[in-house]
């Protein structure tokens, strides 16, 4: 007989998880009033520490969302972090800003950095 026992994470484990990009996204943001859940490939991509990352992708695979979520998380986890979205066209870049703003709006107020610039092409936090 197999018994599954749920163990509550310790405060240290929660802090360590939230200090990662994927943990922050999944622990601090929501989609449709439910915690954000990333696919395994999104977690793997976000946690990659390589200086340069290249992706050969098709459309509608969730990478635009992952890029926006990663930029938002790093802006909150790292001081003086800057993310630049280079896209096929301006509308595609604006879409990533919209995703980041949507996730920012779902974060607990106590965790939100102050939003000092908010327009269609830029978000700046202090």
What role is predicted for each listed range?
Residues 2-126:
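Phosphate/NTP-binding elements of NTP-utilizing enzymes
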């Amino acid at each position: 007989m197999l018994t599954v026992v749920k163990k509550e994470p310790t405060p240290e484990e929660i802090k360590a998880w939230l200090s990662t990009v994927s943990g922050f996204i999944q622990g601090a943001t929501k989609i449709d009033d439910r915690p954000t859940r990333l696919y395994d490939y999104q977690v793997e991509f976000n946690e990659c520490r390589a200086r340069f990352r290249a992706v050969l992708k098709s459309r509608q695979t969730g990478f635009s969302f992952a890029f926006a979520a990663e930029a938002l998380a790093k802006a909150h986890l790292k001081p003086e972090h800057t993310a630049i979205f280079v896209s096929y066209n301006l509308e595609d870049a604006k879409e990533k800003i919209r995703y980041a703003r949507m996730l920012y709006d779902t974060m607990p107020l106590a965790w939100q950095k102050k939003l000092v610039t908010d327009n269609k092409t830029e978000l700046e936090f202090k």
